[in-house]
């Protein structure tokens, strides 16, 4: 019986040992789809409130059995159980300061949003926190986030009053108090000094105070110069700039003004001024001369010396001495008294006035020229526009109508001499009013007969009864022909002139009487020639 109960190894199915392994792989594959989403870093201000987000993704049918928050060293900060609610086991992280944003102690609902809120953030709250979900049946899923506690510093800058000297000393100080992390301080200056920073604990635990001192060799020219303290911190959207005006104490630097090299005998109310630059301000002014003799007409009035009347005693060297808390400074001014006023100054003044007047006149002339040029250009543009309109439109010249032409007084015909007192016209002007000018074939140019042809035998008449008669030309005939040639030349010149004025006139021109005989059909028999 026992032997029959034991199956031989050869009858075992080869796939049975692989089934547990396959189920385990499928379970792990499904579990890998579930993850915890947290932020890698969260910053919170000291004394403020901050939230640490933590979410279980994606939404599944898995049941969350517990959620816990713990530090990197394993200290449990907060816990939530669907049945037992919220728990804060560490006294440092009490329920007065910590809370779950979505969870409620009275609810046993499934919790997939485990966001934890801190109130009254402390420096010791900074560190790594692990959000852990215990799920069934996939097990535990976790995410780690780093909480950083920062403190915004308070900043101010001030000048350090120093006295002029050969050694480098601190002339300005910039302080950034209570920063976490420490602030970074730099200086912006054109004086070429150097900065030195020191660090000390802040008022609150975990904060730092930075003190930066700007140093240089104090000189008089550094007094009143502005330098800038630049403070950078990650809690600032942009750096903070703090300007500082340096204060360097130095003795008076003195100069004298008011002498114009035109002090002459009899000049009244001449003034010398003692100009002083110092820190602090001078407390005393003293006027004297190098000769030790002070002119009776000169009166010292603080920083000014008033000379009521210039005399030969004023021809000396005046000294102004100024004193302040640091030291004393002095300056000298040589006075040269002239016998009479100098004209150099007047000439210079006149030159200046003349130059100003000349500049005004030149400006006025230039402005006038510009206005004239603009007006001329404007007129030229208007004239060009008018000419363009005239060219585009019909011609302005209108020739006389044929009717008006016919009504003009008839020109005398060319006469030819037949005898001593008889004259007969060869041809009269002809115009057909029924035919338009465009239909008539009018030659523009006419070939005139030569002088020999004009002076040859003349045609006196035509008859079919006998031969033509030849008549030798007499003196009157030759004279008439020459007059006819002159008239024809004048007519040709007039036609050319009219053609140049308006080409349309040529279409309405009429043949002149002098060449009318060329187009008329008649003949004279040879028997008529004399």
Curated annotation (Swiss-Prot):
Residues modified to Phosphothreonine: 401
Name of protein: Nectin-2
Glycosylation site list: 128, 138, 315
Cysteine pairings via disulfide bonds: 54-131, 174-229, 274-320
Signal sequence annotation: 1-31
Expressed in which tissues: Brain, spinal cord, spleen, kidney, heart and liver.
GO molecular function: cell adhesion molecule binding; identical protein binding; protein homodimerization activity; receptor ligand activity
Ig-like C2-type domain location: 153-247, 252-337
The keyword Cell cycle is assigned to this record: no
Disordered: annotated span: 382-407
Subcellular location as annotated: Cell membrane
Keywords: Cell adhesion, Cell membrane, Disulfide bond, Glycoprotein, Immunoglobulin domain, Membrane, Phosphoprotein, Receptor, Repeat, Signal, Transmembrane, Transmembrane helix
Organism for this UniProt entry: Mus musculus
Recorded GO CC terms: apical junction complex; cell surface; cell-cell contact zone; cell-cell junction; plasma membrane; zonula adherens
Summary of the function given for this chain in its UniProt record: Modulator of T-cell signaling. Can be either a costimulator of T-cell function, or a coinhibitor, depending on the receptor it binds to. Upon binding to CD226, stimulates T-cell proliferation and cytokine production, including that of IL2, IL5, IL10, IL13, and IFNG. Upon interaction with PVRIG, inhibits T-cell proliferation. These interactions are competitive. Probable cell adhesion protein.
GO annotation terms (biological process): acrosome assembly; cellular anatomical entity morphogenesis; cilium organization; coreceptor-mediated virion attachment to host cell; cytoskeleton organization; establishment of localization in cell; establishment of mitochondrion localization; fertilization
Cytoplasmic side: 373-530
Start and end residues of each Ig-like V-type domain: 32-147
Subunit record text: Can form trans-heterodimers with NECTIN3. Interacts with CD226 or with PVRIG; these interactions are competitive and have a differential functional outcome on T-cell activation, either positive or negative, respectively. Binds with low affinity to TIGIT.
PANTHER family for this protein: NECTIN-2
PROSITE patterns: IG_LIKE
Keyword set includes NAD: no
UniProt membrane topology term: Single-pass type I membrane protein
Family matches, as InterPro entries: CD80_C2-set, Ig-like_dom, Ig-like_dom_sf, Ig-like_fold, Ig_sub, Ig_V-set, Nectin/PVR
